[in-house]
């Protein structure tokens, strides 16, 4: 039977560890067993238990302190991830061979790992050899995405990971619970955007004709092929988390091969209502 994996990606500070923590709690409430693997060798702390931690294999601080290497923070991280890619047997031993595994991989935030280096692609290929169905989950801070220019930048970051890894990908705006009501109204247009209206918003202040043409080309590409769409993620709202989980499950076909399991005693049936996030907030 297949196993399932989410590669949780996104820039530093986008909420990857918080996403893993809240998603694990949400899945536990649904009687689903989900484990987390930390793949960030520079992580300092996280508030969830992990089944494997790359820092047990190699840690950035140790690499930076090695006089024979003389790496800085970014070089140290790249060295750690390349070392990890050469030692996938360590990860295999940590994961074991349990069927129906559902694992969240908390990945580093440096974009060069997805655009310039083969490490993450090699990880995906290795997981697929271990019979994992893999979905990329790309996070972007919603507070960063409230302007057209920044939104287009976020689209390009998400596209770079999507093109590099060649796996199903769900793009998420995190920290929706931190936005004001006014900001939520503003950001709603970016969840399923009209790219041609964004072109007008983005190019109005541009003096360079080259940048105007580039912006129009990017927006046209995204709109013509429907390549990027963002889902809102509000950790204080169960319905928002349900919608995100449903999209990911659909991408990796979770549940199609699972055997039926009786719910635990005194456990209420989970709601199957997956209304859109903003529908109930229109009157707020």
UniProtKB/Swiss-Prot annotation:
List of residues binding GTP: 13-18, 174-177
CDD domains on file: GPN3
GO function terms (MF aspect)? GTP binding; hydrolase activity
Q: Name one Pfam family in it.
A: ATP_bind_1
Entry keyword annotation includes Hydrolase:
yes
Sorted keywords for this record are:
GTP-binding, Hydrolase, Nucleotide-binding
Provide the Gene Ontology terms for cellular component.
protein-containing complex
| Sequence segments annotated as region (Disordered) | 262-284
- Residues forming the motif Gly-Pro-Asn (GPN)-loop are 72-74
Recorded superkingdom: Eukaryota
Cross-referenced InterPro entries: Gpn (IPR004130), Gpn3 (IPR030228), P-loop_NTPase (IPR027417)
Statement: the UniProt record of this protein carries the keyword Hydrolase:
yes
Swiss-Prot/TrEMBL site (Stabilizes the phosphate intermediate) positions: 74
**PANTHER family, alphabetized:** GPN-LOOP GTPASE 3 (PTHR21231:SF7), XPA-BINDING PROTEIN 1-RELATED (PTHR21231)
Family assignment?
Answer: Belongs to the GPN-loop GTPase family.
Q: How does it assemble?
A: Heterodimer with GPN1. Binds to RNA polymerase II (RNAPII). Interacts directly with subunits RPB4 and RPB7 and the CTD of RPB1.
In UniProt terms, what function does this protein have? Small GTPase required for proper localization of RNA polymerase II (RNAPII). May act at an RNAP assembly step prior to nuclear import.
Recorded protein name is: GPN-loop GTPase 3
Q: Which organism is it from?
A: Mus musculus (Mouse)
